[in-house]
Amino acid sequence: MANIKLKNYQSYAKINLFLHILNKRDDGYHNLQTWFTFLDLKDHISFRFNNSNKIEITSNIQIASKEDNLIYKAVKEFQEAYNIESIGVDIDIIKNIPMGAGLGGGSSNAATTLIALRDYYLPELSNEQMIPLATKLGADVPIFVYGRSAWAEGIGDVLYSKDFEQQYVVLVKPNIHISTKEFFESENLVKTKNMLPRDLSFDTSVMHNDFENVFFAKYPEFKSQLDEIDQDFRMTGTGSCFYLLSKDLNKLQQLARKVDKSLDKWVVKTLNYAY
């Protein structure tokens, strides 16, 4: 066990460059294909290990109760999976990644927690060895444990390293949301029938987000807002964040100034590693 009692980590956001829903599995999950890359938008998490045998979580925002908190669940799953007799840790998180945005904030925090616990208790474990445990916490948690841009299949847990050429990103987030359950039950969801080859370059003509039609069918006025700025916005995950990619930072900064003041916005850049 390491002697360092306090460790600080950065917990990064992700976007889905595309998201194709293929079919429903016997376990209730859906097989998918997606390409993940990261953003330099991040939360900051500190872990102070102690002998209290208590897990305390604080934040700069209101957070879920322990039973509903992915960070807490990550600690308990790690403790059970690796037979750690007792864990005492004070966890403080400074949230910058918006919640309910499709940016993976909660999943990223859970993955960062697994990595911090690994570093302290079992430093011999590799990130890849923790992916089955990460999958138990949610379909987006494995990519953050994996820690680099990747093509994903299965439920998001079968990962193949695949870099994405760095670009700038403008993110736009409306104060609206659709539940995952509603997405899958919508008559507007058209699933992708054919799998794409993993060596495919980024191609917006064949890569899309199957959930976009559902979102725009429910909120057509938001689509109109986006189209007035630029018609190439794409949704990440199940939203509600939309993003626009460009190698031209000045262009994106100018477009960001056109975004309605009622919408949250960020200008960031993509990253191939979440370290």
Curated annotation (Swiss-Prot):
Family per similarity comment: Belongs to the GHMP kinase family. IspE subfamily.
Gene it is expressed from: ispE
HAMAP family: IspE (MF_00061)
Annotated protein name in UniProt: 4-diphosphocytidyl-2-C-methyl-D-erythritol kinase
S-S pairs: none
Keyword Transferase in annotation: yes
Species of the source: Francisella philomiragia subsp. philomiragia (strain ATCC 25017 / CCUG 19701 / FSC 153 / O#319-036)
Claim: Nucleotide-binding is one of the keywords in the record: yes
Protein function: Catalyzes the phosphorylation of the position 2 hydroxy group of 4-diphosphocytidyl-2C-methyl-D-erythritol.
One Pfam family of this chain: GHMP_kinases_C
InterPro entries, sorted: GHMP_kinase_C_dom, GHMP_kinase_C_sf, GHMP_kinase_N_dom, IspE, Ribosomal_Su5_D2-typ_SF, Ribsml_uS5_D2-typ_fold_subgr
GO BP: any one term: terpenoid biosynthetic process
Catalytic activity: 4-CDP-2-C-methyl-D-erythritol + ATP = 4-CDP-2-C-methyl-D-erythritol 2-phosphate + ADP + H(+)
Pathway: Isoprenoid biosynthesis; isopentenyl diphosphate biosynthesis via DXP pathway; isopentenyl diphosphate from 1-deoxy-D-xylulose 5-phosphate: step 3/6
Source superkingdom: Bacteria
Binding site for ATP: 98-108
Known EC number: 2.7.1.148
Active site: 14, 140
